[in-house]
Amino acid sequence: MYQAGVDFGTISLTPILHGVVATVLYFLVGAAVLVAGFLMVNLLTPGDLRRLVFIDRRPNAVVLAATMYVALAIVTIAAIYASSNQLAQGLIGVAVYGIVGVALQGVALVILEIAVPGRFREHIDAPALHPAVFATAVMLLAVAGVIAAALS
C-alpha cells in the first residue's frame, strides 16, 4: 500500500514580510501624496475644502476633491508600477512623482482658471452642481493620464 504524502518543502515568510512592509510604506507615501493634493486644492479654492466636502456637502467641491484623489491615485499607481526594485529608491521615486503630480495638477487648475471665461472658483461652494466642474474633472484626469504615461 502506498501512503499519500504531500511535501510542502520549506516555507519562508521573509518574502511575504518584505511585501507587507513594502505595501505599508507605499501606502504611507501614497496617502501623503493624497493629503498634499487635498491641501493644494484647498489652497486654490475659496473656503475650507474639508468643510465644503464633508459638512456642507457642496457638490462642486465634492466632484473636484474626488477627481483630484482619482487623478493623484492614477499618478501614484503608475509611479509604483514603474518604480525601482529597490524599495528605498522606489519610495523616493513615488514620492517625487507624486509631488510633481500635485504641482502639475495645481498648475493645470491655475491655467484653467485663467483661460476660461468666468471664475470657476466662485462656484466651488455653490449648493447646485455647476457644469464647469465636469470640465475641470476631465482636465484633471487628462493631466493625470499624461503624467502616468510619461512614467511608463
Curated annotation (Swiss-Prot):
GO CC, one annotated term:
plasma membrane
Residues in the signal sequence: none
Write down the InterPro entries for this protein, in alphabetical order: DUF350
Localization in the cell: Cell membrane
Q: What is its main location?
A: membrane
Keyword Transmembrane recorded: yes
Does the keyword ATP-binding feature in the UniProt annotation? no
As for membrane topology, the entry says: Multi-pass membrane protein
Q: Which UniProt keywords apply?
A: Cell membrane, Membrane, Transmembrane, Transmembrane helix
Q: Which residues cross the membrane?
A: 21-41, 62-82, 92-112, 131-151
Q: Which family does it belong to?
A: Belongs to the UPF0719 family.
Q: Could you identify this protein by its name? A: UPF0719 transmembrane protein Mb2631
What organism is this sequence from?
Answer: Mycobacterium bovis (strain ATCC BAA-935 / AF2122/97)
